[in-house]
């Protein structure tokens, strides 16, 4: 049976639909909903069976932890055993917002939700629809991104319906999300806070607030024997159906390299997609070219990344070449997602031309 789709925004809430969605969560069902980052696939975080349903619907490995979403700061103390001072400072500054913190879990949180770990990842989203749903659903909603595991995360309800329409109970359509990349994840179970996933709240912002904060060295791990402490650390994520490579180097060299690679692929009968910027989109030939935005507007690049990857799926391209996007504030987050989507395939434009 197809999921029921209901439309609403934070400015135009449908409280009857919210109550119905909350009842679905309380009964152990699954509801996809908008947040300020990407769409989430929600289940009752305190119900082990609901968490297992999330893993099954997504085709997600069960050792990949789920983030527990709350809608009231006081709820944090119910699902954790310790809240370090640094975590309290970040919560006061960045919650509600695109920040997830990993803390020691209380017994009330089942291991099915935490991927077998003694820690729990917690977030307080700023989206009003998300907040009202969490309250209606009992206060604790486990929610990874609402997509088939490994695929680009959904930034519109249509993406959710495409991936999970037959596997879940309801989709709340809140329009296109604001940020377009998942939340920053900070681990407070170590001596020094560690960023396990970069996001809108950058390492520099965290260091300005707390002082010593580090970036995890394992952000690029793919070793199957490693147990991930946070969503997205171990498994390939965000990937389009076509083979994706990132071309790095000076702009002129990148354009020449992508055009040459495109020409070679077209000669082999392949359909090519190119992820460009507003500044370069007219310079590519023989390819389906999609601009991800201007290099002067990095938040726009982040906002459009997953949408562009899904658009190329719709266009049925065989191979995708992308420029690199090492922008000042969100470059870490953007390139983290792009590298994972490409399986870390990088082409050096300078070396290619030799």
Where in the sequence are the language-model features?
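Active-site-adjacent structural elements in enzyme catalytic cores
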Residues: 1-354
């Amino acid at each position: 049976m197809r999921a029921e789709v209901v439309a609403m925004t934070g400015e135009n809430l449908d409280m009857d639909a919210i109550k119905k969605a909350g009842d679905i969560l309380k009964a152990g069902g699954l509801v996809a909903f908008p947040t300020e980052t990407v769409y989430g696939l929600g289940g009752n975080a305190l119900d082990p069976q609901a968490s297992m349903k999330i893993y099954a619907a997504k085709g997600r490995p069960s050792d990949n932890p789920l983030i527990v979403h709350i809608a009231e700061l006081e709820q944090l103390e119910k699902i954790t055993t310790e809240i370090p001072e640094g975590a309290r400072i970040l919560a006061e500054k960045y919650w509600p917002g695109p920040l997830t913190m990993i803390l020691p879990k209380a017994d009330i949180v089942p291991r099915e939700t935490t991927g077998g770990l003694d820690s729990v990842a917690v977030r307080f989203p700023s989206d009003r629809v998300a907040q009202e749903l969490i309250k209606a659903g009992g206060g604790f909603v486990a929610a990874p991104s609402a997509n088939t595991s490994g695929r680009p995360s959904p930034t519109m309800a249509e993406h959710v319906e495409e991936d999970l329409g037959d596997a879940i109970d309801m989709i709340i359509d809140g329009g296109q999300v604001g940020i377009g990349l998942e939340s920053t994840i900070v681990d407070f179970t170590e001596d020094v806070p560690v960023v396990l996933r970069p996001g809108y709240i950058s390492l520099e912002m965290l260091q300005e607030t707390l002082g010593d904060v580090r970036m995890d060295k394992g952000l690029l791990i793919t070793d199957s024997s490693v147990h991930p402490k946070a969503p997205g650390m171990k498994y390939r994520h965000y990937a389009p159906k076509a083979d994706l490579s990132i071309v790095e180097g000076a702009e002129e060299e990148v354009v020449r390299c992508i055009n040459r690679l495109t020409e070679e692929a077209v000669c082999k009968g392949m359909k090519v997609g190119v992820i460009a910027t507003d500044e370069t989109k007219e310079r590519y030939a023989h390819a389906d070219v999609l601009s991800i935005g201007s290099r002067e507007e990095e938040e726009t690049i982040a906002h459009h990344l997953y949408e562009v990857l899904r658009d190329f799926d719709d266009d049925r391209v065989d191979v995708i070449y992308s420029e690199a996007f090492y922008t000042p504030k969100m470059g870490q987050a953007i390139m983290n997602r792009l590298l994972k989507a490409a399986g870390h395939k990088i082409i050096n434009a300078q070396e290619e031309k030799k």
